[in-house]
């Protein structure tokens, strides 16, 4: 047992209150305090400083010991209280565990005794030894109670509810199957329509390829409607996406920029129109114009018409692009480029080749209704249409030329030709027209000289042979030979003076590869007699010169004739 110390406050009475009759020494007066001190100390004769110091130290030690004793007693009291609480809780826990074990054992024994009549072996393994000793294993049994009529009604209602739920589920499943069948049938119809349209495009001899739809990256089929496989090197390859409509299964035509970086592009359809303006009464008036003539409704299928329409306008765009390339080389020969128009000026005639935006709603523009103003406005319509057809044919020839270069064995020469070749489309047209004009000018020069020296000559004869380079060809010549070879024409002038001397003048008009430059080669041979001229013997070569201007050759020929006569 821990020893407990009890301290009694002397100032407290038996009820725990301070006694009012006890005097507080701190509040006593001096005359009351001195007698009490004398009574306690009795005598001050033997009081010294050391004795007082010892007394004070002893009093301090006593107070410290009292404080320590008080703290120890408090700690012991707290520990005793905690131990008591722990023991109490431990006892309650043990009691609860025992109660739980007893109740569990009783429940187990009850269940074991209940099933002992059905499963004896299982009951023996689980029943407690005490119960098996005092109670017979099969003494406890159970019976099933009979059901009331309400239970039968409830079971019937339950069966009815079950059948209703089954019927409802069956109806929902039937609707789902019917909806799935309808959707599947619609999908089959859409797929059949889609592949039928793809087959129509393929049957139209179109080239198809696989690609991704740039809108949703889904698999799709594209079509090549351009002329890349025919020899075209135009930057627009003519590619389009055949996009499927998920609602109907039909396909629609959408041009794209390229295969690798496919983007849907909105193209502006343009076509080429040729106009001729002639000088009438000092003013240039429209005397001819080509007609836009293309049937976009040849097929019953809109997708085929869209492809043909895109192919037509792509060809027109490529043609005008090649014409612009050539026109830049002919700027010094009265050929100018203004916006989307090429202007050619030749001998009081202006030929305009213009790229016009196609507007299917503007029928007056397409059919030239406004052109029939006077008798001259349609004078050269056929000529304009022939010029346009010629330009298109020459572009096809250029395609064929490029295709042959691609089929040849790749060498440095063929690669150079592929990258540096320019089409012969506009230059042959302008060159041959200028050549015809040069022939007229040359003939007028010779006629003027013959007329000027007519009195001094006894005989003169002029023969003109046009395009002698084509005349030497066989009958199976290339119909485009005139457009791919530079023109060569010949003037043969024979003069005879009063003394029967003969002067044979041969003039050849040609050009270079540009088809527009003027090259004149003149050869003059003098014969003493007419027989020498006929036999082509004893001829004296007087002149053999080349010219590029009619004034120069006129002066030179005039001087030669004056010396001859």
Curated annotation (Swiss-Prot):
Q: Compositional bias (Polar residues) at which positions?
A: 138-152
Q: Which domain of life is it from?
A: Eukaryota
Q: Which GO terms describe its biological process?
A: regulation of transcription by RNA polymerase II
Question: Does Transcription count among this protein's keywords?
Answer: yes
Q: Name one GO cellular component term.
A: core mediator complex
Is Transcription there in the keyword field? yes
Q: Which compartments is it annotated to reside in?
A: Nucleus
Give one GO molecular function term. transcription coregulator activity
**UniProt function note:** Component of the Mediator complex, a coactivator involved in the regulated transcription of nearly all RNA polymerase II-dependent genes. Mediator functions as a bridge to convey information from gene-specific regulatory proteins to the basal RNA polymerase II transcription machinery. Mediator is recruited to promoters by direct interactions with regulatory proteins and serves as a scaffold for the assembly of a functional preinitiation complex with RNA polymerase II and the general transcription factors.
Query: Keyword annotations for this protein?
Result: Activator, Nucleus, Transcription, Transcription regulation
Listed Pfam families: Med17
List the lineage, top down: Eukaryota, Fungi, Dikarya, Ascomycota, Saccharomycotina
Subunit note? Component of the Mediator complex.
Species, as recorded: Candida albicans (strain SC5314 / ATCC MYA-2876) (Yeast)
> Which InterPro entries does the UniProt record give?
Mediator_Med17
Q: Positions of the region Disordered?
A: 138-160
Designated name of the protein = Mediator of RNA polymerase II transcription subunit 17
Give the chief site where it resides.
nucleus
Bilayer-crossing residues are none
Q: Which family does it belong to?
A: Belongs to the Mediator complex subunit 17 family.
């Amino acid at each position: 047992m821990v020893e407990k110390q009890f301290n009694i406050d002397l100032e407290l009475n038996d009820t725990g209150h301070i006694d009012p009759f006890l005097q507080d020494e701190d509040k006593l007066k001096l005359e009351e305090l001195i007698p009490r001190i004398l009574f306690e100390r009795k005598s001050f004769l033997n009081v010294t400083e050391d004795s007082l110091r010892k007394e004070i130290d002893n009093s301090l030690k006593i107070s410290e010991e009292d404080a320590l004793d008080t703290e120890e007693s408090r700690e012991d009291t707290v520990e005793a209280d905690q131990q008591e609480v722990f023991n109490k809780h431990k006892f309650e826990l043990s009691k609860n565990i025992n109660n739980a074990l007893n109740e569990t054992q009783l429940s187990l024994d009850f269940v074991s005794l209940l099933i002992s009549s059905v499963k004896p072996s299982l009951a023996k393994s689980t029943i407690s030894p005490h119960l098996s000793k005092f109670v017979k294993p099969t003494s406890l049994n159970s019976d099933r109670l009979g059901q009331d009529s309400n239970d039968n009604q409830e079971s019937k209602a339950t069966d009815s509810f079950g059948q209703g739920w089954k019927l409802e589920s069956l109806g929902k499943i039937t609707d789902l199957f019917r909806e799935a069948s309808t959707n599947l049938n619609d999908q089959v119809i859409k797929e059949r329509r889609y592949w039928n349209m793809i087959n129509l495009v393929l049957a139209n001899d179109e080239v198809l390829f696989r690609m991704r739809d740039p809108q949703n990256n889904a698999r799709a089929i594209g079509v090549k409607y351009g002329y890349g496989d025919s020899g075209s090197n135009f930057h627009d390859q003519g590619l389009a996406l055949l996009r499927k409509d998920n609602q109907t299964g039909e396909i629609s035509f959408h041009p794209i920029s390229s295969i690798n970086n496919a983007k849907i592009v909105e193209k502006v359809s343009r076509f080429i129109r040729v106009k001729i303006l002639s000088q009438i009464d000092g003013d240039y008036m429209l005397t001819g114009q080509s007609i836009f003539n293309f049937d976009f409704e040849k097929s019953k299928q809109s997708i085929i018409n869209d492809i043909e329409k895109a192919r037509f306008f792509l060809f027109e765009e490529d043609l005008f692009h090649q014409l612009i390339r050539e026109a830049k080389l002919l700027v010094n020969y009265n050929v100018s480029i203004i916006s989307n128009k090429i202007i050619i000026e030749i001998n009081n005639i202006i030929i305009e080749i213009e790229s016009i935006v196609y507007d299917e709603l503007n029928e007056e523009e397409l059919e030239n209704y406004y052109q029939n103003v006077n008798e001259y406005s349609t004078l050269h319509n056929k000529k304009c249409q022939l010029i346009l057809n010629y330009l298109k044919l020459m572009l096809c020839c250029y395609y064929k030329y490029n295709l042959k270069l691609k089929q040849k064995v790749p060498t440095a020469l063929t690669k150079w030709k592929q990258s540096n070749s320019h089409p012969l489309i506009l230059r042959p047209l302008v060159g041959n027209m200028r050549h015809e004009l040069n022939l007229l000018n040359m003939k007028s020069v010779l006629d003027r000289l013959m007329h000027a020296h007519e009195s001094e000559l006894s005989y003169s004869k002029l023969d003109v042979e046009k395009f002698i380079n084509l005349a030497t060809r066989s009958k199976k010549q290339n119909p485009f030979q005139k457009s791919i070879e530079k023109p060569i024409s010949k003037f043969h002038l024979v003069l005879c003076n009063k003394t029967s001397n003969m002067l044979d003048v041969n003039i050849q008009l040609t050009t270079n590869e540009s088809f527009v430059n003027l090259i004149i080669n003149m050869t003059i041979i003098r014969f003493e007699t007419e027989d020498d001229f006929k036999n082509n013997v004893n001829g004296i070569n007087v002149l053999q010169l080349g010219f590029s201007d009619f004034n120069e050759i006129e002066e030179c020929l005039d001087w030669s004739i004056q010396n001859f006569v």
